[in-house]
UniProtKB/Swiss-Prot annotation:
GO cellular component assignments: nucleus
Biological process, per Gene Ontology: chromatin organization; regulation of macromolecule metabolic process; regulation of primary metabolic process
Organism of provenance: Arabidopsis thaliana
Residue stretches of biased makeup (Polar residues): 662-671, 725-736, 780-800, 965-985
Lineage per the UniProt record: Eukaryota, Viridiplantae, Streptophyta, Embryophyta, Tracheophyta
Protein name: SWI/SNF complex subunit SWI3D
Length: 985
């Protein structure tokens, strides 16, 4: 039976294995392993006598378990001890899966580590860059004018709305001596003085050299600039490290007001900037920040409070009284008020309760409306008598009344609100004008055309008729004013072009900054979870947490990594003793003022010298110059109607005539060569324009050197007296540069025609100026060198007509190109610096506030623990008192107990007839009797027989004398009836 079972089990095992793995069917090895497995299974389950043969499912489960978990053994690895390999596919699958998981984990782990290491390296590089920038700032020369980042609004040429709001007296037009021009001149003078030497400390006495404005205006402007750190800002640490403590104290007293921005007060926050500060009441520049200790010291100097007496009973009611505002100096004490001891025309509602503070200055924090009304009433009655005013208010001291009156916003706030409307409206109009370029372009040509028309009328009246003998001379000189007119128009166009380019650049800059800021704002609102629509406006007040929304906007604007690194670096700077490191980290170099602001006298002197030389050399040629100018205008008006082919043909003829001998003198040729060499060797640069030469003036022959640069600077400053002289100078220089020569017949014809039709000439000049303004200076000056030398008459008109007809969108393309060129130049570096400074300041402020909160929490915790200790001590003292009381009661009870024991012993001794011991009353007996055995008789001493009980005696029988004597010897004070009472009990 046993063998059949084994064979059947082996057959079943072999069948199961063959069904799972067909490849192992012809091999005989699985039978032996199956049998061995069966024997092992029987050995494991041998304890169960009622178990049947193992099924196929159980065998498969056991084989899988053996395949996945190798058996633990100590013997040799034989075939009998090996795990059955009937399921190789399952074992291989498990092994391959484990290997794949291990390889996958090993593959992901290096990637994560690599990314982490990369982030760490980038962070270290960013911190190293910030520290390098900081070290560069620290090692910078102190002669460089640096300002804090929050002064990025400052501009040498413009007035910011912040300046208009802070100093409204210069912009509201209410004071004659205070205008925007006066403010700009004072500001630029002070800034220029400090910019030239940043190591100095500008004070009020240094402003005596300035002749513009009064002393108060100078002081206001200086303190405003000092407050913002534009002057007297020295962020660089001192080089001498061995200074003493006294030197540091002196330096701290003389520090600029700006350093207070980087120090955070514990008691109160930094107050906002006062719009109209009282500069006369400030002894030092630090007076802009109110000193909280001044009021306390002022209050400490106050004398005792005023005493008040009741009008009814004359009692002292200074502590608590009832005051009647209807009648002066009428006060009642509490008892009289409750008793109703006041006049018949008064009621209890007419009185107010007055309870002064315990000490001076305690009640200065809050002022009720009634107290404020009393203060104003007292000011009207007593004027400047503050003792009477304090007595009238009754609840405040004199110092408190004075301080409250100084802090009251009486009318300054309302005046400031009125003043703010004018600058805002002015800004809106300025923005509208700057954005509307067409209106600017229309107004400028009209003024130029009107001015030109007056000059042309005067010129046409003074033109003399040429004689027959001088026809050749007039024809030769008539070519010179043509070029002069052309150069004059080009000069006027160049003067207007920088204004157009400046307006376009500013608009492009504003658009670029606005787009980046709006993008950062949109992303910040999305990060906070606020769904924004194109129609809705962004407002931090709509957010659930406006503070976090603002922080997200600043981080988006500056960059998360840069903002975090800068905040950490600023927090690390808190370990220093002052805010010097913070000030040094957040500052930048202020750009130099424009050249025309630096040395305006130089250009004026140069132009004056040039005008003087021209007047001396051409004093006798002014009538001829005027006639030449009229002839040139007529030639230009005729050539505008000529086609391009005729112009080219005429140009060739004029060039051929020039090449003939005798057409031009050797002197003029030598002068022309010298002028050309001078122009080719010295490129033209303009001070007012920031564009390179190839943008403003692509043709060098078009732009003369000194002759054109000086009229460009001082063209608007020429007086009416020297105007003709300057025009003659320009025409003479242009005539030297012009080579061609017009024929005599054409010139005479054009001259006569210009005399006949002066209105057409003026109209043509106006159209030319209009086209020059609309198309820009680049189109006016874009004529090549050859056309300049070959076309003295039609060179300017032909390109203008062609440009106006062929490129109608030239202005839009030019504006687009300038926008693309200025986007890289006018980036948002200042905006990013401001955002970084704001985030760093917020981080430092939060760190300081966190420290203050921690200190306050620690202080409150300490006070709480101290209070608990006081309570515990109070409880322990109560327990000690209770314990002492208990001990006293216990001692008293113990004494009572001892007395009772003694009395009991005496009673027992008296009953037994034994003389009591001679011990003291408080001493215990020799043999104490337990309390539980009260009726047990006392044993007699050793050697004595137990006494017999007394014999009953008749009532009248006398007591033996021995007993009486024994009783007397004990010295007991108890009477005999007492013993009878005890015995009876």
């Amino acid at each position: 039976m046993e063998e059949k079972r084994r064979d059947s089990a082996g057959t079943l095992a072999f069948a199961g294995s063959s069904g799972d793995s067909p490849a192992s069917e012809p091999m005989p090895a699985p039978r032996r392993r199956g049998g061995g497995l069966k024997r092992k299974a029987n050995a494991l389950g041998g304890s169960n006598f009622f178990s049947s043969a193992p099924s196929k499912r159980m065998l498969t489960r056991e084989k899988a378990m053996l395949a996945s978990f190798s058996p633990v053994h100590n013997g040799p690895l034989t075939r009998a001890r090996q795990a059955p390999s009937i399921m190789p596919s399952a074992a291989d699958g498990v092994k391959s899966e484990v290997l794949n998981v291990a390889v996958g984990a090993d593959g992901e782990k290096p990637k994560e580590e690599e990314e982490r290491n990369k982030a760490i390296r980038e962070w270290e590089a960013l911190e190293a860059k910030i520290e390098a920038d900081f070290e560069a700032i620290r090692s910078r020369d102190s002669n460089v004018h640096v300002v804090p980042n929050h002064c990025g609004w400052f501009s040498w040429e413009k007035i910011h709305p912040l300046e208009e709001r802070s100093l409204p007296s210069f912009f509201n037009g209410k004071l004659e001596g205070r205008t925007s021009e006066v403010y700009r001149e004072i500001r630029n003078w002070i800034m220029g003085k400090f910019h030239s030497n940043p190591n100095i400390q500008i004070e009020l006495k240094d402003l005596t050299e300035l002749e513009v404005g009064d002393s108060e205006a100078k002081q206001e402007v200086m303190e405003f600039l000092d407050y913002w750190g534009l002057i007297n800002f020295h962020p660089f640490p001192p080089t001498d490290t061995g200074s003493t403590a006294s030197d540091h104290d002196d330096l701290g007293d003389k520090e600029s007001l700006l350093n207070s921005l980087y120090r955070f007060q514990v008691d109160e926050a930094c107050p906002p900037l006062v719009h109209k500060p009282r500069f006369t009441a400030q002894a030092t520049p630090s007076g802009l920040f109110p000193d909280p200790m001044a009021a306390d010291e002022l209050l400490k100097q106050e004398g005792p409070a005023v005493e008040y007496h009741c009008n009814s009973c004359s009692a002292d009611c200074s502590r608590k009284r009832y005051h009647c505002p209807k009648q002066a100096d009428f006060d009642l004490c509490t008892e009289c008020f409750n008793s109703g001891k006041f006049s018949s025309d008064m009621s209890s509602s007419d009185f107010i309760l007055m309870e002064p503070a315990e000490a001076p200055g305690v009640g200065s924090g809050k002022w009720t409306d009634q107290e404020t009304l009393l203060l104003l009433e007292a000011l009207e009655i007593f004027k400047e008598n503050w003792n009477e005013i304090a007595e009238h208010v009754a609840t405040k001291t004199k110092a408190q009344c004075m301080l409250h009156f100084l802090q009251m916003p009486i009318e300054d706030a309302f005046l400031d609100q009125i003043d703010y409307k004018d600058p805002i409206s002015k800004d809106t109009t300025d923005l509208a004008v700057s954005k509307d370029d067409n209106s600017v372009l229309k107004d400028a040509p009209e003024e130029a055309e009107n001015k030109k028309r007056v000059d042309e009328d005067e010129t046409m009246k003074e033109v003399p008729e040429p004689e027959d003998g001088n026809e050749e001379k007039v024809s030769q000189e008539s070519s010179k004013p043509g070029d002069a007119s052309e150069e004059t128009n080009e000069m006027e166009a160049e003067q207007k072009t920088p204004k157009l380019e400046t307006a376009i650049e500013e608009r492009c800059k504003d658009e670029a900054d606005e787009n980046i800021a709006l993008k950062a704002l949109t992303e910040a609102f999305e990060d906070v979870g606020h769904s924004s629509t194109p129609e809705a406006s962004f407002s931090f007040a709509d957010l659930g947490n406006p503070v976090m929304g603002l922080a997200a906007f600043l981080v988006r604007l500056a960059g998360s990594d840069v903002a975090t690194a800068s905040a950490r670096a600023s927090i690390k700077s808190l370990h220093s003793n002052s805010g010097m490191l913070l000030a040094t980290r957040h500052c930048y170099i202020l750009e130099d003022p424009p050249d025309n602001k630096k040395d305006p006298t130089k250009s004026k002197s140069c132009s004056a010298d040039a005008e003087g030389n021209d007047d001396n050399s051409h004093k006798d040629d002014q009538p001829e110059e005027k006639s030449k100018k009229a002839e040139e205008v007529s030639l230009n008006s005729d050539d505008r109607e000529m086609p391009d082919t005729d112009t080219g043909k005429e140009t060739q003829d004029s060039v051929s005539e020039e090449k003939q001998p005798g057409s031009r003198t050797e002197n003029s040729t030598t002068k022309l060569d010298a002028v050309q060499e001078k122009r080719s060797s010295k490129p033209v640069t303009t001070d007012n324009s920031e564009k390179p030469v190839d943008i403003i003036c692509p043709s060098q022959d078009k732009c003369s050197g000194k002759e054109l640069q000086e009229p460009l600077k001082d063209g608007n400053k020429l007086s009416s007296e020297n105007k003709d002289a300057s025009q003659s100078t320009v025409s003479q220089s242009a005539a030297d540069a012009s080579q061609p020569e017009a024929s005599r017949d054409v010139e005479m014809k054009d001259t006569l025609q210009s005399e006949k039709d002066p209105e057409d000439v003026v109209k043509t000049v106006g159209e030319k100026v209009q086209l020059a303004k609309e198309e820009g200076a680049n189109d006016v000056l874009s004529t090549p060198d050859k056309s300049v030398s070959q076309q003295p008459i039609g060179s300017a008109s032909a390109p203008e007509n062609g440009t106006a007809g062929g490129n109608p969108n030239i202005e839009g393309k030019k504006e687009k190109d300038i926008c693309e060129g200025t986007k890289d130049k006018y980036n948002i570096e200042k905006l990013k610096r401001a955002a970084i400074s704001a985030i760093s300041a917020a981080a430092v402020k939060a760190k300081n506030l966190a420290k203050q909160e921690e200190d306050q929490i620690r202080q409150l915790s300490g006070s709480l623990i101290e209070k608990q200790l006081h309570k515990l001590e109070a409880k322990l003292s109560i327990f000690n008192e209770a314990e002492s009381l208990t001990m006293r009661v216990r001692e008293q009870l113990e004494r009572s107990r001892q007395r009772l024991y003694h009395e009991r012993a005496q009673i027992i001794a008296a009953r037994l007839g034994v003389p009591p011991s001679m011990s003291s009353k408080a001493s215990l007996p020799t043999n104490r009797i337990a309390a539980n055995f009260a009726n047990v008789a006392q044993r007699p001493p050793m050697g004595m027989a137990f006494p017999r009980p007394p014999m009953p005696r008749p009532p009248g029988f006398p007591v033996p004398g021995s007993f009486v004597a024994a009783t007397t010897m004990t010295g007991s004070s108890d009477p005999s009836p007492g013993s009878d009472n005890v015995s009876s009990v």
